[in-house]
Protein backbone atom coordinates (compact mmCIF):
# COMPACT_ATOMS: atom_id res chain seq x y z
CA UNK A 1 0.00 0.00 0.00
CA UNK A 2 2.92 2.22 0.82
CA UNK A 3 4.25 1.59 -2.70
CA UNK A 4 0.91 2.51 -4.26
CA UNK A 5 0.78 5.64 -2.21
CA UNK A 6 4.21 6.58 -3.45
CA UNK A 7 3.15 5.89 -7.03
CA UNK A 8 0.07 8.01 -6.53
CA UNK A 9 2.20 10.82 -5.24
CA UNK A 10 4.56 10.47 -8.20
CA UNK A 11 1.61 10.52 -10.61
CA UNK A 12 0.22 13.53 -8.84
CA UNK A 13 3.56 15.30 -9.15
CA UNK A 14 3.77 14.41 -12.86
CA UNK A 15 0.21 15.62 -13.46
CA UNK A 16 1.00 18.83 -11.68
CA UNK A 17 4.16 19.33 -13.75
CA UNK A 18 2.25 18.54 -16.94
CA UNK A 19 -0.45 21.04 -16.10
CA UNK A 20 2.06 23.69 -15.12
CA UNK A 21 4.41 23.25 -18.07
CA UNK A 22 2.82 21.32 -20.90
CA UNK A 23 -0.66 22.81 -20.82
CA UNK A 24 0.53 26.41 -21.32
CA UNK A 25 2.77 25.12 -24.08
CA UNK A 26 -0.14 23.31 -25.69
CA UNK A 27 -2.28 26.43 -25.37
CA UNK A 28 0.51 28.51 -26.89
CA UNK A 29 0.90 25.99 -29.67
CA UNK A 30 -2.84 26.04 -30.26
CA UNK A 31 -2.77 29.83 -30.40
CA UNK A 32 0.12 29.73 -32.84
CA UNK A 33 -1.70 27.22 -35.04
CA UNK A 34 -4.88 29.30 -34.88
CA UNK A 35 -3.01 32.48 -35.80
CA UNK A 36 -1.19 30.66 -38.56
CA UNK A 37 -4.47 29.41 -39.96
CA UNK A 38 -5.98 32.90 -39.81
CA UNK A 39 -2.91 34.37 -41.46
CA UNK A 40 -2.95 31.67 -44.11
CA UNK A 41 -6.63 32.37 -44.71
CA UNK A 42 -5.93 36.08 -45.11
CA UNK A 43 -3.04 35.35 -47.46
CA UNK A 44 -5.26 33.08 -49.55
CA UNK A 45 -8.03 35.71 -49.67
CA UNK A 46 -5.55 38.43 -50.60
CA UNK A 47 -4.07 36.16 -53.25
CA UNK A 48 -7.54 35.51 -54.65
CA UNK A 49 -8.30 39.25 -54.71
CA UNK A 50 -4.96 39.98 -56.37
CA UNK A 51 -5.61 37.23 -58.91
CA UNK A 52 -9.05 38.72 -59.66
CA UNK A 53 -7.50 42.17 -60.00
CA UNK A 54 -4.86 40.83 -62.39
CA UNK A 55 -7.54 39.03 -64.41
CA UNK A 56 -9.72 42.16 -64.60
CA UNK A 57 -6.73 44.26 -65.60
CA UNK A 58 -5.76 41.72 -68.24
CA UNK A 59 -9.33 41.62 -69.54
CA UNK A 60 -9.49 45.42 -69.70
CA UNK A 61 -6.14 45.57 -71.46
CA UNK A 62 -7.22 42.86 -73.88
CA UNK A 63 -10.52 44.65 -74.48
CA UNK A 64 -8.76 47.95 -75.13
CA UNK A 65 -6.27 46.23 -77.40
CA UNK A 66 -9.11 44.51 -79.23
CA UNK A 67 -11.00 47.78 -79.61
CA UNK A 68 -7.87 49.49 -80.89
CA UNK A 69 -7.33 46.60 -83.26
CA UNK A 70 -10.94 46.76 -84.44
CA UNK A 71 -10.68 50.54 -84.88
CA UNK A 72 -7.46 50.08 -86.83
CA UNK A 73 -9.11 47.46 -89.03
CA UNK A 74 -12.11 49.73 -89.64
CA UNK A 75 -9.81 52.63 -90.52
CA UNK A 76 -7.72 50.41 -92.78
CA UNK A 77 -10.92 49.21 -94.44
CA UNK A 78 -12.06 52.78 -95.03
CA UNK A 79 -8.68 53.68 -96.52
CA UNK A 80 -8.77 50.62 -98.75
CA UNK A 81 -12.29 51.46 -99.91
CA UNK A 82 -11.32 55.05 -100.64
CA UNK A 83 -8.24 53.87 -102.56
CA UNK A 84 -10.46 51.50 -104.51
CA UNK A 85 -12.90 54.31 -105.30
CA UNK A 86 -10.07 56.51 -106.52
CA UNK A 87 -8.68 53.67 -108.62
CA UNK A 88 -12.11 53.04 -110.15
CA UNK A 89 -12.58 56.76 -110.80
CA UNK A 90 -9.21 56.98 -112.49
CA UNK A 91 -9.71 53.85 -114.57
CA UNK A 92 -13.38 54.09 -115.46
CA UNK A 93 -14.28 57.76 -115.16
CA UNK A 94 -11.21 59.86 -115.93
CA UNK A 95 -9.56 57.56 -118.46
CA UNK A 96 -12.86 57.04 -120.28
CA UNK A 97 -13.53 60.78 -120.22
CA UNK A 98 -10.05 61.52 -121.58
CA UNK A 99 -10.51 58.97 -124.34
CA UNK A 100 -13.92 60.38 -125.25
CA UNK A 101 -12.70 63.99 -125.23
CA UNK A 102 -9.66 63.13 -127.34
CA UNK A 103 -11.93 61.50 -129.88
CA UNK A 104 -14.34 64.44 -130.01
CA UNK A 105 -12.01 67.43 -129.73
CA UNK A 106 -9.52 66.21 -132.33
CA UNK A 107 -12.22 66.17 -134.98
CA UNK A 108 -11.54 69.09 -137.40
CA UNK A 109 -15.24 69.90 -137.65
CA UNK A 110 -15.61 70.16 -133.88
CA UNK A 111 -12.44 72.25 -133.59
CA UNK A 112 -13.76 74.61 -136.26
CA UNK A 113 -17.05 75.03 -134.37
CA UNK A 114 -15.10 75.82 -131.19
CA UNK A 115 -13.05 78.52 -132.95
CA UNK A 116 -16.16 80.01 -134.58
CA UNK A 117 -18.00 80.08 -131.24
CA UNK A 118 -15.08 81.80 -129.52
CA UNK A 119 -14.72 84.46 -132.25
CA UNK A 120 -18.45 85.18 -132.22
CA UNK A 121 -18.44 85.44 -128.41
CA UNK A 122 -15.67 88.05 -128.50
CA UNK A 123 -17.52 90.04 -131.17
CA UNK A 124 -20.79 89.85 -129.26
CA UNK A 125 -19.09 91.28 -126.19
CA UNK A 126 -17.75 94.17 -128.26
CA UNK A 127 -14.13 93.16 -127.74
CA UNK A 128 -11.70 94.13 -130.46
CA UNK A 129 -8.05 93.31 -131.00
CA UNK A 130 -5.73 90.87 -132.66
CA UNK A 131 -7.16 87.38 -132.40
CA UNK A 132 -5.05 84.25 -132.57
CA UNK A 133 -6.76 80.87 -132.73
CA UNK A 134 -4.93 77.71 -131.71
CA UNK A 135 -6.14 74.17 -132.24
CA UNK A 136 -4.97 70.82 -130.90
CA UNK A 137 -1.66 69.36 -131.99
CA UNK A 138 -3.42 66.26 -133.31
CA UNK A 139 -5.80 68.26 -135.54
CA UNK A 140 -5.28 69.24 -139.17
CA UNK A 141 -5.03 73.05 -139.42
CA UNK A 142 -5.86 72.92 -143.13
CA UNK A 143 -9.05 70.95 -142.49
CA UNK A 144 -10.13 73.38 -139.75
CA UNK A 145 -9.44 76.44 -141.91
CA UNK A 146 -11.48 74.95 -144.74
CA UNK A 147 -14.35 74.27 -142.33
CA UNK A 148 -14.20 77.83 -140.96
CA UNK A 149 -14.16 79.58 -144.30
CA UNK A 150 -12.79 83.04 -145.07
CA UNK A 151 -15.50 84.77 -143.05
CA UNK A 152 -13.84 83.58 -139.84
CA UNK A 153 -10.22 83.06 -140.90
CA UNK A 154 -10.04 86.65 -142.17
CA UNK A 155 -10.66 87.85 -138.61
CA UNK A 156 -7.68 85.94 -137.29
CA UNK A 157 -4.22 87.47 -137.01
CA UNK A 158 -2.57 84.69 -139.00
CA UNK A 159 -5.51 84.43 -141.43
CA UNK A 160 -6.08 80.96 -140.12
CA UNK A 161 -5.63 78.73 -137.12
CA UNK A 162 -2.26 77.62 -135.77
CA UNK A 163 -1.28 74.43 -133.99
CA UNK A 164 -1.13 74.63 -130.19
CA UNK A 165 0.56 72.45 -127.56
CA UNK A 166 -2.63 70.85 -126.23
CA UNK A 167 -4.30 67.67 -127.49
CA UNK A 168 -7.58 68.88 -128.93
CA UNK A 169 -10.19 71.62 -128.78
CA UNK A 170 -9.30 75.27 -129.29
CA UNK A 171 -8.00 78.45 -127.68
CA UNK A 172 -8.56 82.05 -128.71
CA UNK A 173 -6.07 84.71 -127.63
CA UNK A 174 -6.92 88.42 -127.47
CA UNK A 175 -3.39 89.77 -127.55
CA UNK A 176 -4.01 93.38 -126.49
CA UNK A 177 -5.84 92.25 -123.35
CA UNK A 178 -3.62 89.24 -122.73
CA UNK A 179 -6.74 87.06 -122.61
CA UNK A 180 -6.94 83.39 -123.46
CA UNK A 181 -10.36 81.85 -123.97
CA UNK A 182 -9.72 78.17 -123.37
CA UNK A 183 -11.88 75.28 -124.49
CA UNK A 184 -9.02 72.88 -125.09
CA UNK A 185 -9.47 69.20 -124.30
CA UNK A 186 -7.48 69.70 -121.07
CA UNK A 187 -9.71 72.57 -119.93
CA UNK A 188 -12.84 70.60 -120.81
CA UNK A 189 -11.52 67.59 -118.89
CA UNK A 190 -11.00 69.70 -115.78
CA UNK A 191 -14.44 71.27 -116.14
CA UNK A 192 -16.29 68.00 -116.72
CA UNK A 193 -14.39 66.23 -113.95
CA UNK A 194 -15.43 68.86 -111.41
CA UNK A 195 -19.05 68.80 -112.50
CA UNK A 196 -19.53 65.08 -113.13
CA UNK A 197 -17.28 63.42 -110.54
CA UNK A 198 -19.77 63.77 -107.68
CA UNK A 199 -22.60 62.32 -109.78
CA UNK A 200 -20.34 59.50 -110.91
CA UNK A 201 -19.38 58.66 -107.32
CA UNK A 202 -23.00 58.66 -106.18
CA UNK A 203 -24.04 56.48 -109.10
CA UNK A 204 -21.24 53.92 -108.73
CA UNK A 205 -20.67 53.91 -104.96
CA UNK A 206 -24.14 54.71 -103.59
CA UNK A 207 -24.30 51.36 -101.75
CA UNK A 208 -20.73 51.52 -100.36
Curated annotation (Swiss-Prot):
Q: Which GO terms describe its biological process?
A: proton motive force-driven plasma membrane ATP synthesis
Q: List the source organism.
A: Chlamydia muridarum (strain MoPn / Nigg)
What gene is this protein a product of? Answer: atpE
Protein family membership:
Belongs to the V-ATPase E subunit family.
InterPro entries named in the record: ATPase_V1_Esu, T3SS_HrpE/ATPase_suE
* Highest rank taxon of the organism: Bacteria
Keyword Ubl conjugation: yes or no? Answer: no
Q: Which Gene3D superfamilies match?
A: 1.20.5.2950
Q: Which molecular function terms from Gene Ontology are attached?
A: ATP binding; proton-transporting ATP synthase activity, rotational mechanism; proton-transporting ATPase activity, rotational mechanism
Could you tell me what this protein does?
Produces ATP from ADP in the presence of a proton gradient across the membrane.
Protein name in UniProt: V-type ATP synthase subunit E
- What is the taxonomic lineage of the source species? Bacteria, Pseudomonadati, Chlamydiota, Chlamydiia, Chlamydiales
The Gene Ontology CC terms held by the record are: proton-transporting two-sector ATPase complex, catalytic domain
Provide the transmembrane region boundaries. Answer: none
- Asked if the record carries the keyword Protein transport, the reply is no
Keywords in alphabetical order, please: ATP synthesis, Hydrogen ion transport, Ion transport, Transport
Amino acid sequence: MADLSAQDKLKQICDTLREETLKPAEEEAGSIVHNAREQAKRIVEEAKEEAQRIIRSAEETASQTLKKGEAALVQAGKRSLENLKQAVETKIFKESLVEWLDGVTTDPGVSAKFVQALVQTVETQGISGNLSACIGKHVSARAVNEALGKEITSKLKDKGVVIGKFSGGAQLKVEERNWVLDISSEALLDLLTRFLQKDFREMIFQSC
